[in-house]
From Swiss-Prot:
<protein>
    <recommendedName>
        <fullName>Histidinol-phosphate aminotransferase</fullName>
        <ecNumber>2.6.1.9</ecNumber>
    </recommendedName>
</protein>
<comment type="similarity">
    <text>Belongs to the class-II pyridoxal-phosphate-dependent aminotransferase family. Histidinol-phosphate aminotransferase subfamily.</text>
</comment>
<keyword id="KW-0368">Histidine biosynthesis</keyword>
<feature type="modified residue" description="N6-(pyridoxal phosphate)lysine">
    <location>
        <position position="220"/>
    </location>
</feature>
<comment type="subunit">
    <text>Homodimer.</text>
</comment>
<keyword id="KW-0032">Aminotransferase</keyword>
<dbReference type="InterPro" id="IPR004839">
    <property type="entry name" value="Aminotransferase_I/II_large"/>
</dbReference>
<keyword id="KW-0808">Transferase</keyword>
<comment type="pathway">
    <text>Amino-acid biosynthesis; L-histidine biosynthesis; L-histidine from 5-phospho-alpha-D-ribose 1-diphosphate: step 7/9.</text>
</comment>
<keyword id="KW-0663">Pyridoxal phosphate</keyword>
<dbReference type="InterPro" id="IPR005861">
    <property type="entry name" value="HisP_aminotrans"/>
</dbReference>
<dbReference type="GO" id="GO:0000105">
    <property type="term" value="P:L-histidine biosynthetic process"/>
</dbReference>
<dbReference type="GO" id="GO:0030170">
    <property type="term" value="F:pyridoxal phosphate binding"/>
</dbReference>
<dbReference type="Pfam" id="PF00155">
    <property type="entry name" value="Aminotran_1_2"/>
</dbReference>
<keyword id="KW-0028">Amino-acid biosynthesis</keyword>
<dbReference type="InterPro" id="IPR015422">
    <property type="entry name" value="PyrdxlP-dep_Trfase_small"/>
</dbReference>
<dbReference type="InterPro" id="IPR001917">
    <property type="entry name" value="Aminotrans_II_pyridoxalP_BS"/>
</dbReference>
Length: 350
């Protein structure tokens, strides 16, 4: 076995509902607000597309040609610039596997998505983690840490778990400082939720920065977390390399047709994003708003030096959230879900 695996833990998504009920001695139904999922589900067109599939005895299209064609038209990029994977986790793994070797290091932030670090360590690569500044990526400090050993720079924008973002001015200024041999991966898993005018569109920056890789997903805003479909958009040269480490038939037939159907129903997406925006704003109008980091996504981050206590209070209030070292991340749910959250947080800080 690889010796570096000895120090790695197994990723845990949290306890099951039944395990939580036993541990905290609670009954009833939970609001599942731990994984930033879409609480209302995908477009009805997705279910129709999936029900129409009856050739499940055959392997899916290994090249995801139809989905790539749909994404190509949607973003006005060449289909050869697109890589499709079983969620962004697989895309992150492919990029890391293709690019990293023991002689280099990655740059990322301490308080961000853990898979960037996990796959660097699996590839025996050094990880240089830079603290967040006011809950967001500190790109100025990234500049100070870049050197000839830097292989990949990972930027989560908006950031998970804080929900903050770097502006277009901040991002383009940073990209201009990065050597063209260094990959910059811009993880935009939550970009659909951002309604701020100064938020950068990563795909629009690809022509200026050929070393940029943009990641997006159908798991969050489109509500297809159970189907696992993510994708990267970048230069054809990068895609050609990533395809060499891609597993054959990596995305299921049902996932492919579901993603195509979801992409077509943009009105459904807009309606859900509007719902999310309305519900998110209510959190930042609450009496406890000083304990929140300003989020532009489908989740909030509650700052507290007692995250386990808040997590337990939420469980006893019928809400499953995600505890972190310095707070708790809570997905924005339905109106009823969010009322539960408001009640618990108000009580916790009163």
């Amino acid at each position: 076995m690889k010796p570096q695996l000895e120090s790695l833990g197994v990723y845990k998504a949290g306890l099951s509902e039944e395990a939580l009920k036993r541990k905290f001695n609670v009954e009833g139904e939970f609001s599942r607000l731990a994984s930033n999922e879409n609480p209302i589900g995908p477009s009805p067109q997705v279910y129709e597309a999936i029900r129409s599939q009856d050739a499940l005895n055959y392997y899916p299209d290994p090249e995801a040609i139809q989905l790539k064609a749909s994404l190509s038209e949607f973003y006005q990029v060449d289909s050869e610039q697109i890589l499709v994977g079983a969620g962004l986790d697989e895309i992150i793994m492919m990029i890391s596997r293709a690019r990293l070797n023991p002689k280099g290091h990655i740059l990322t932030s301490e308080g961000t998505f853990i898979q960037y670090t996990t796959h660097a360590l699996i590839e025996d690569n050094e990880v240089v983690s830079i603290p967040l500044k006011e809950g967001k990526f500190d790109l100025e400090s990234f500049k100070d840490k870049m050197n000839d050993e830097t292989s990949i720079i990972w930027i989560c924008n908006p950031n998970n778990p804080t929900g903050t973002y770097v502006t277009e001015t901040e991002l383009t200024g940073f990209l201009e400082s990065v050597h063209e041999d260094v990959m910059v991966v811009l993880d935009e898993a939550y970009f659909e939720f951002v309604l701020r005018e100064d938020y950068p569109d990563g795909v629009a920056l690809l022509k200026r920065f050929p070393n940029l890789i943009v990641l997006r997903t159908f798991s969050k805003a489109y509500g297809l977390a159970g189907l696992r479909v993510g994708y990267a958009i970048t230069s054809k040269a990068y895609i050609d390399v990533f395809n060499k480490v891609k597993l054959p038939f990596n995305v299921t037939a049902l996932s492919l047709v579901g993603a195509i159907a979801a992409l077509k129903d943009q009105q459904y997406l807009k309606d859900y994003v509007a719902h999310n925006d309305k519900e998110r704003n209510k959190f930042f109008e609450a009496d406890y708003k000083e304990h929140l980091i300003d989020s532009v996504t489908n989740f909030i981050f509650v700052k507290t030096n007692q995250p386990e206590a808040l997590f337990e209070a939420l469980i006893k209030g019928g809400v499953i959230a995600r505890p972190m070292p310095n707070g708790v991340r809570i997905s924005i749910g339905t109106r009823d879900d969010n009322e539960k959250v408001h009640k618990v947080i108000n009580s916790f800080f009163s």
